[in-house]
Amino acid sequence: MPVTLHTPPAFDLTPTEIARWAAIPVAVAVDLGRDAGLIDPAIRPLRPAGQQPRLFGQAVTVRCEAPDFGAVLHALDVIQRGQVLMIDAAGHRDTAMIGDILSGHLRNKGIAGLVCDGAVRDTGTLGGWDDFLVFSRWITPRGPTGADRGAVNLPVVIGGCLVSPGDLVIGDDDGLVSLSPRIVRTRIADAEAKLFRESDWTSALASGKSAAEVFGLAPTIQP
């Protein structure tokens, strides 16, 4: 069956709506609760902790039927600068869906990075880039064996999270979150408020206030 290219929904978030999330860490976004699409933390960045720039951009999705990677190939001509390639390979661990050649092409196009719920290879190269970020569940040296099946720009499941084309994807050392356009619009004020509270807590603790005072803990009792 040939690769299916779906027409994506209009990516109708404004640059301003997207930009406000650029300062929000994944942990703060996830603290919003069920509205935030937490992606399985087992999908990890290739770069070491502390050296991982933020992954940030709207999703272009592919569903692969590993060991076939046809959908990834077709996505190369669809994805646009600043977007994130989200590869649903159903957690397949034995065959890489992408390596340095295709990732290098995406990098040259100005793509923000990729997330693979499956395997990647050539990680020495991929992990050395600080302007193209790669998250993957698995690493394997074995390459794909077909390019005839799959689909592009449809809802997929990445790490147990439903991800649709146009969702905002944020990644950092702690993991990944996917936010629907509705959540991007309606929960940014809550995320910014949480970030402000965390800054307030840090300042209060540094000033010498007790944890009980800062966090409003109930009085303790003596045994």
Feature locations, PLM:
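Feature captures the catalytic cores and cofactor-binding loops of soluble hydro-lyases/lyases
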Residues: 1-165, 171, 179-223
